[in-house]
């Protein structure tokens, strides 16, 4: 029997569905769902974990022996080696908490114990006992084991912990790793046809991060709480991520509190190129507005003086007309951070964005959404992805245009990793296939992918300087001349701000100004 270990139950279901010749048989082992199916006559079983099934914790106490030095003592009485700096006092101690005759108790929140807690051994304790029991039951009978957790640092650690549980009951079964970035039949089939060894270094990196979280969080949380409340009252939590984030928020809040608002005045003029002098109705395509060249007047008297100068004026002279084209490069592929930023601009919060993205990934619509990479790997068949989503009527014509234009070339971001590709669509979806919120995010991802394969956009900017009774006004407009990638990716695109045709030296109607 081949045992396949996944990170979540949904993944166990999906892999069984994609690999099994027939519909998998749902079963339970000690109340944990498992899925049985055959592959070429061999029985396979998939089991989903619940993320981490082991969690780190300090040993409850430390003891010191003159010949052996320091060691941590687990709840079961097992001694784990410990390395403490020579600067820390050693027994014999007076028996006053947290000290014992030959060591230090670490469970209680005592200030004196914190210097020792930093160096205490860390053990892994069962977090999901029922799942561990089920996993071991299956592992006993397994001829081979495939770890199919997410292929990233955290997934490798989760898989490594699961494997350690399996090894407690089966030390001989061959172990391999399935790496995949999407729940599609080609991707999963390829992953299981090209199994690789476990990446112990990647798992160790995940373990180091988790240990640092524990050391930082446990020691500093206790310290801050004890300093503030002498052991009483609310806990003052600290963490590797939350504390620096809090510092950023505090710094920004201090800037906000220190900000002294200043009054300013803005003057806007109304113009009409359809006449040489006003007043006119100020409507239609020839009408436009322009602010004073001094965008913000800091002195009220100066703003009033400018308003006095233009009071009664009915005409403005076009002093200059400047036109300049600029190229806007297509965007780079989505990683997690840029996806959350783009989704936030569309009204989807980061937390909701990741919930939806995880759901789309599990349903086979997008690739793995927790990535740093912004460079598509050479192994990704871009044309195949374009063809896969071309069935959506909203993208079909654009997809066909891309494919007919020649070899596809994608933009490249600054971050290139080898674990997962950037986020891209893996299957066609329409509004009929998904909920409104899910499709909104899918649509963003699909259009972004197509945009990364597209050419730049060209925008023509126009700047017109006008003179009204000696006061300068400046009108600006932008027009999308060559849509390029903007034809498929309209996000963040400003509406064309078209100015009427104006020539230097011409007179246009001035219909007054507001301040």
Spans of features found by a protein language model:
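Intrinsically disordered, low-complexity regulatory segments
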Residues: 1-216, 497-498, 511-514
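Active-site phosphate-binding and catalytic loops of NTP-dependent enzymes
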Residues: 23-28, 174, 197-202, 222-226, ...
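Helical mechanochemical/support elements of P-loop NTPase systems and associated helical scaffolds
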Residues: 11, 127-138, 154-162, 184-188, ...
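Generic, well-ordered alpha-helical scaffold segments in large soluble proteins
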Residues: 18, 138-141, 161-165, 191, ...
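Long, highly charged, low-complexity internal segments
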Residues: 41-47, 51-124, 233-358, 400, ...
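Extended, highly charged linker/hinge segments and catalytic-adjacent loops that couple domains
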Residues: 199-202, 206, 213-220, 225, ...
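Beta-sheet entry/capping signal
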Residues: 1-4, 43-45, 143-146, 173-177, ...
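Short glycine-centered, acidic/aromatic-flanked micro-motifs in structured strand/loop junctions
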Residues: 149-151, 341-343, 370
């Amino acid at each position: 029997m081949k045992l396949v270990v996944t990170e979540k139950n949904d993944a166990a279901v999906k892999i069984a569905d994609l690999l099994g010749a027939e519909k998998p048989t749902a079963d339970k082992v000690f109340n944990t769902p498992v899925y049985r199916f055959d592959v070429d006559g061999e029985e396979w079983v998939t089991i989903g974990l619940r993320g981490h099934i082991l969690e780190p914790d300090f040993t409850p106490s430390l003891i010191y022996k003159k010949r052996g030095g320091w060691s941590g003592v687990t709840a079961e009485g097992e001694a784990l080696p410990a390395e403490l700096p020579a600067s820390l006092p050693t027994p014999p101690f007076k028996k006053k908490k947290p000290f014992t005759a030959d060591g230090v108790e670490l469970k209680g929140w005592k200030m004196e114990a914190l210097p020792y807690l930093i160096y205490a051994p860390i053990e892994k304790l069962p977090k999901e006992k029922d799942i561990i029991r089920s996993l071991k039951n299956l592992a006993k009978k397994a001829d081979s084991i495939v770890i199919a957790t997410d292929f990233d640092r955290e997934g490798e650690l989760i898989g490594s912990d699961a494997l350690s549980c399996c090894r407690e009951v089966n030390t001989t079964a061959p172990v391999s790793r399935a790496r995949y970035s999407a729940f599609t039949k080609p991707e999963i089939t390829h992953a299981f046809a090209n199994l690789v060894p476990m990446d112990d270094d990647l798992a160790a990196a995940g373990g180091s991060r988790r240990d640092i979280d524990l050391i930082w969080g446990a020691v500093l949380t206790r310290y801050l709480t004890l300093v503030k409340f002498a052991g009483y009252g609310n806990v003052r939590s600290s963490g590797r991520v939350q504390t620096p984030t809090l510092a950023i928020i505090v710094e920004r809040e201090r800037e906000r509190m220190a900000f002294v608002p200043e009054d300013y005045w803005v003057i806007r003029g109304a113009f009409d190129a359809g006449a040489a002098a006003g007043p006119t109705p100020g409507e239609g395509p020839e009408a436009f507005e322009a602010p004073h060249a001094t965008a913000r007047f800091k002195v009220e008297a100066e703003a009033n003086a400018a308003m006095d100068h233009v009071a009664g004026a009915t005409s403005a002279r076009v002093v200059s007309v400047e036109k300049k084209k600029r190229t806007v490069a297509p965007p780079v592929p989505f990683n997690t951070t840029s996806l959350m930023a783009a989704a936030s601009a569309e009204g989807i919060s980061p937390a909701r964005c990741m919930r939806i993205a995880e759901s789309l990934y599990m349903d086979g619509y997008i690739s793995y959404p927790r990535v740093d990479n912004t460079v598509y790997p050479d192994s990704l068949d871009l044309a195949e992805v374009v063809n896969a989503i071309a069935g959506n009527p909203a993208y079909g014509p654009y997809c066909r245009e891309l494919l007919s234009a020649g070899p596809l070339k994608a933009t490249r971001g600054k971050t290139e990793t080898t674990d997962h590709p950037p986020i891209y669509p893996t299957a066609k979806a329409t509004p009929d296939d998904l909920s409104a919120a899910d499709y909104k995010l899918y649509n963003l991802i699909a259009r972004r992918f197509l945009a990364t394969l597209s050419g730049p956009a060209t925008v023509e900017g126009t700047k017109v300087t006008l003179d009204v009774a000696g006061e300068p006004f400046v009108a600006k407009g932008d027009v999308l001349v060559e849509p390029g990638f903007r034809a498929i990716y309209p996000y963040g695109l400003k509406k064309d701000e078209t100015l009427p045709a104006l020539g230097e030296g011409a007179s246009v109607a001035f219909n007054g100004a507001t301040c």
